[in-house]
């Protein structure tokens, strides 16, 4: 049954299906009670003008270059290098304060823990190597350096690791890691968590096993350009891999440092516990980089980070969870022109009250659950994405209102092209005070194409409202042809008549609102 005059992607859909085999999925076990569904809905044509939007304006990325980073490096004042004990240092309290945390470093250093500090000006790594005893920091072969102690960049320090360094190895046995409390520039090099016993990378073995990491605190700037980082991070706070984080709330009040920032450009991250993590970070840019075969997440901005740009990256092979996820009030950010594929769960996730974000022009395919997932995050614009051959839904929207889906192509996904639903999460282990939610969902779907999805193009349960306009539905996988699920299925003939035959916008509205049903 051909419902639309142009078949611009149907041949591609057929080819994908033949080449890859149909995506398959099993329904997950329901772990929380579902709300009562609305009984009756009205279907009517809606005015078109409010639905018409110009393509979203994208941020200008031309200034985020390797050359621009070089101009930021102030080499005028030579810095100081010293060895100091790790205790009494604000930058290291997270790792040695309370709960017998210092035992990790006592054991690894066989004595009172100490670190290498860079203060009061610019130091490059080759200079640093000349100022630290060889048992702590040495050149093991030309251009290859091994650090056996943590390296800390002080508040007025600038550390530069550049192309003169072929590789910086951070010793797992020695307990080495990098903490930036000033400015850190890593360009044209490699930084690797290193297992001396194996004379090779500190590849992941266990979540609790220490591996080297990089952490930049509040008030800092971090620039990583044309660099490979590998085998970082484990399941300890702020030790996840590459982390950019404001100080903990009590320390942040005392120290009064602004939110950290920085750029990552043209770099590669692999075998990291988290490829990237940030907390209360602003204006950070991750551009044209590769995140591959990381353990839990590829890119994971968190808590109250804002105005982030995640653009032109390739994220794949994440082993436990999602490729790209922003979670807990990560607002006003751009996730654009990325590829996210072959990840264990979803390709891109917007989670926990993250609002006013743009997810646009991404290619998201072969993920083991959804292409794009929105959980409890309203007021987001999803524009011009291609969601192909994901095992579950192309786009899934849960407990989120005013979600605008424009010009997306969801094709050959295992279940539904676009799936909207509500869920009561109060019976789960969620902290409702920290992460509140409303059991409401509303969608506007304009343009694009929903083709050859296993369970149909669209399914929406108990929406506050749904508007559909110019949505092309082609190549149904069911012998019965196009079938809409959820509340749309009950009024399918009317909806398709308005949407397809009359080319009108369709508004589906419940007669009784969710609040009335809850009462």
From Swiss-Prot:
Signal peptide interval: 1-25
Single Gene Ontology MF annotation: isomerase activity
GO terms under cellular component: periplasmic space
Keyword check for Ribosomal protein: no
InterPro entries in alphabetical order: Beta_helix, Carb-bd_sugar_hydrolysis-dom, Mannuronan_C5-epimerase, Para_beta_helix_rpt-2, PbH1, Pectin_lyas_fold, Pectin_lyase_fold/virulence
Keyword flag Transmembrane: no
Chief location of this protein within or outside the cell: periplasm
NCBIfam families reported in the protein's UniProt record: epimerase_AlgG, para_beta_helix
Function summary: Catalyzes the epimerization of beta-D-mannuronate to alpha-L-guluronate during the synthesis of the linear polysaccharide alginate. In addition, is part of a periplasmic protein complex that protects alginate from degradation by AlgL by channeling the newly formed alginate polymer through a scaffold that transfers the alginate polymer through the periplasmic space to the outer membrane secretin AlgE.
Similarity comment text for this entry: Belongs to the D-mannuronate C5-epimerase family.
Name of protein: Mannuronan C5-epimerase
Organism: Pseudomonas putida (strain ATCC 47054 / DSM 6125 / CFBP 8728 / NCIMB 11950 / KT2440)
């Amino acid at each position: 049954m051909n419902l639309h005059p142009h078949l611009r992607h149907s041949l591609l859909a057929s080819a994908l299906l033949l080449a890859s085999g149909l995506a398959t999925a099993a329904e997950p076990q329901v772990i929380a009670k579902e709300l009562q569904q609305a009984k009756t809905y009205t279907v009517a044509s809606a005015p078109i003008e409010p639905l018409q939007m110009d393509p979203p304006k994208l941020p200008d990325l031309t200034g985020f270059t390797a050359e621009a980073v070089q101009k930021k490096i102030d080499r005028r004042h030579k810095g100081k290098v010293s060895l100091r004990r790790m205790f009494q240092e604000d930058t290291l309290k997270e790792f040695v304060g309370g709960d017998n945390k210092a035992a990790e470093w006592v054991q690894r250093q066989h004595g009172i823990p100490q670190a290498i500090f860079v203060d009061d000006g610019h130091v490059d790594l080759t200079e640093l190597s000349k100022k630290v005893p060889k048992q702590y920091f040495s050149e093991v072969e030309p251009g290859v350096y091994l650090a056996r102690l943590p390296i800390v960049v002080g508040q007025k320090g600038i550390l530069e690791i550049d192309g003169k360094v072929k590789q910086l190895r951070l010793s797992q046995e020695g307990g080495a890691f990098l903490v930036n409390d000033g400015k850190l520039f890593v360009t044209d090099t490699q930084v690797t968590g290193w297992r001396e016993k194996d004379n090779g990378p500190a590849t992941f073995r266990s979540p609790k096993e220490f591996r080297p990491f990089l952490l930049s605190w509040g008030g800092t700037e971090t620039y990583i350009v044309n660099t490979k980082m590998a085998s970082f991070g484990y399941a300890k706070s702020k030790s996840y891999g590459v982390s950019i984080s404001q100080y903990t709330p009590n320390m942040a009040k005392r120290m009064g440092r602004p939110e950290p920032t920085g750029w990552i450009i043209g770099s590669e991250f692999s075998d990291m516990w988290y490829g990237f993590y940030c907390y209360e970070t602003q204006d950070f840019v991750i551009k044209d980089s590769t995140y591959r075969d990381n353990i839990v997440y590829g890119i994971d901005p968190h808590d109250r980070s804002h105005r982030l740009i995640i653009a032109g990256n390739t994220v794949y092979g994440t082993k436990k969870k999602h490729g790209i996820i922003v979670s807990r009030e990560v607002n006003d950010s751009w996730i654009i022109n990325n590829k996210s594929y072959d990840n264990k769960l979803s390709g891109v996730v917007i989670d926990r009250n993250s609002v006013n974000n743009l997810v646009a022009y991404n290619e998201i395919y072969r993920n083991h659950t959804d292409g794009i997932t929105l959980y409890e995050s309203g007021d987001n614009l999803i524009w011009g994405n291609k969601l192909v051959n994901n095992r579950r839904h192309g786009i899934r929207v849960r407990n989120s209102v005013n979600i605008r889906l424009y010009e997306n192509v969801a094709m050959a996904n295992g279940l539904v092209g676009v799936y909207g639903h509500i869920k009561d999460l109060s019976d789960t282990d969620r902290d409702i005070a920290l992460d509140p939610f409303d059991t409401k969902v509303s969608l506007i779907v304009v343009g694009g194409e929903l083709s050859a999805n296993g369970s149909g193009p669209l399914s929406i349960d108990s929406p506050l409202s749904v508007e559909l306009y110019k949505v092309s539905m082609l190549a149904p996988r069911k012998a019965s042809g196009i079938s809409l699920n959820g509340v749309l299925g009950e009024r399918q003939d009317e909806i398709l008549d308005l949407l397809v035959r009359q080319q009108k916008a369709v508004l589906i509205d419940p007669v009784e609102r969710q609040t009335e049903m809850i009462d």
